[in-house]
Amino acid sequence: MFHRTWTVLFILMGIFVWCEASSGATPLDSLIPRRDLPGGWVLIHGPQIYNKKTLFEHINGQAELYLKYGFRQSVFAIYQDKKKAQNQIEVDIYDMGNVVQAFGVFSRFRNEDRPGGFGLDSYLDDHSASFYKGKYFVMAYATESNPDLMSQFSKLIALKISDSSPPPKEISYFPKSGFKAGSIQYFPEGLLGHQFLKRGFQGTYVEEVEVKDKIEDKNKAKTGGKEFNLFLAIFKDSQEAMNALKVYKDDLSKKGKVSPESLIQIGTNALKGEDPYQGKVIVLQKGFYLLGVLGFEKEEVGENRLAEFMKNVK
C-alpha cells in the first residue's frame, strides 16, 4: 500500500512538471537582461515584480489603462552607465495575457510611425523605446538621448521572449491604400466611444480633398489631406453583431441622421448616415464583425475603402 501511494505521487509530480514545461511558462524576471549588456552598463535595481494589486504603486496614473487591457504582472529594472551615474535606462516588461492585449497597450502608447526593428512592432525615439512580442509589452526610457542604445536593450529583451504568437490577424484586414502608417489601435471596450460596439480595432486613412489657398489666392484651390477612420468591432457571434448594428442605427437616428439610401449592393445588414461629431458613416455586418468607415468627405472614397476592407475580412 505504501509503495503504491508513492508510485502514484511520483506519477502525479511527473505530470505536473511535464505540464509546466510544455506550457512554455517563462518567469517574468528572467526576461530582464543581466549578461552581455552594452559596454559600460550595469543593472543597479531590480528585477522588481508588480501584480494587479501593487501596480498602482509603480505607475499610479496609468495602472487603470493596463488593467483594462488584461494586465497580469510586470517586472521593472534600472540600468546605469558606470562612467556617468546620472545616465540611466528604466525598463518595464508587462505580461498582458495574450498578443491582442499586448498590441492594444502598445498601440495606445505609440505616438507615430517610428519603427525600431524589434518585436512584432515597435516604436523608437531619442529617449524611449517600446514594442510588443507575444503576450508581452515592453517600455524603456533613457535619461539621456541615445536611440542606438535603446535599440540594443530592446533587442536583448526581444531575444529572451520565446512567445512566438503572430500579430493579431485583424491588423492585416485593414486596406493599404491611403493608410496612415502606425495608426491602428485596439480597444478592449467602448470602440469609438460607443459601449455597444464593445472591443475592436480602428485605423486612420488620408483622403485627398480640395481646399482653398488662403495665402496666395482665395479663389485658388489646392489638394490637402483629410483624415477618416475604418473600424472593426468584434462580437461573440453574428446575432450579437446584428443586435449591435440595430442599436447603432437607433443611436444614430437620435443624435444624427440615418440615410434612407439603399445599400443592398453591399449587404442587407448595413447602416448609412451622419454622426454630428464623427461625420458621414457607413456600417456593415459580416459574420461576428461590424465593419465601418466614418469621417470621410467623398462618398466614393468611403465606399471603396470599406469594400476593400470587407473583402479582406475572413
Where would I find each of the regions flagged by the language model?
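A short acidic-to-branched-hydrophobic micro-motif
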Residues: 67-107, 138-140, 207-213, 217, ...
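Bacterial N-terminal signal peptides
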Residues: 8-17
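Bacterial N-terminal signal peptides that target proteins for export
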Residues: 1-9
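Short Gly/Thr-rich strand-loop-strand
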Residues: 40-70, 86, 95-134, 173-198, ...
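A surface/extracellular/periplasmic glyco- and lipid-processing/surface-interacting theme
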Residues: 138-195
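Boundary at the C-terminal end of the N-terminal hydrophobic targeting segment
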Residues: 19-25
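Extended intrinsically disordered, low-complexity coil regions enriched in Ser, Thr, Gly, Ala
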Residues: 95-117, 144-166, 226-260, 296-314
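Short, surface-exposed beta-strand/loop micro-motifs that present aromatic residues
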Residues: 74-82, 125-132, 200-223, 271-273, ...
